[in-house]
Design a protein with these regions (language model features):
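Non-catalytic, surface-exposed connector residues within folded enzymatic/regulatory domains
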Residues: 3, 22, 36-39, 78
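Conserved short hydrophobic interaction patches
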Residues: 27-30, 81
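Enriched for short, Lys/Arg-rich terminal
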Residues: 61-62, 66-91
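A short, surface-exposed loop/turn module that caps and links secondary-structure elements
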Residues: 30-55
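Arg/Lys-rich, positively charged N-terminal/basic patches that mediate binding to nucleic acids
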Residues: 1-27
Length: 91
């Protein structure tokens, strides 16, 4: 799986605590190998017609992404689930 990132994602990643950044790396590698691996707890977000998904970094942090075909995805947002599930981000 090829992964692209947005400027927003990159900026948010840099603001994360180092411990969360360190947890994100192996989860991203797992996503590259198998985006539907059970430990990622992937879920499609609402509204479902936006085709936006999330997976867990840990209990509190998520990566929001969109598939761009069979072997490509773009990471849109990363952060605490209370912050990134604010649907204003998707408008």
């Amino acid at each position: 799986m090829e992964i692209l990132t947005t400027v927003t994602f990159d900026a948010l990643f840099k603001e994360l605590p180092f411990v969360v950044q360190a947890k994100a790396a192996p989860k991203t590698d797992l996503f590259k190998d198998n985006p539907f691996h059970p430990s990622l707890r992937i879920e499609k977000l609402r509204p479902k017609n936006f085709n936006i998904w999330s997976f867990r970094i840990d209990l509190h942090y998520r990566i929001i992404f969109k598939f761009l075909g069979k072997n490509k995805a773009v990471f849109l947002f990363i952060g605490h689930h209370h912050e990134i599930y604010d649907y204003d981000l998707f408008k």
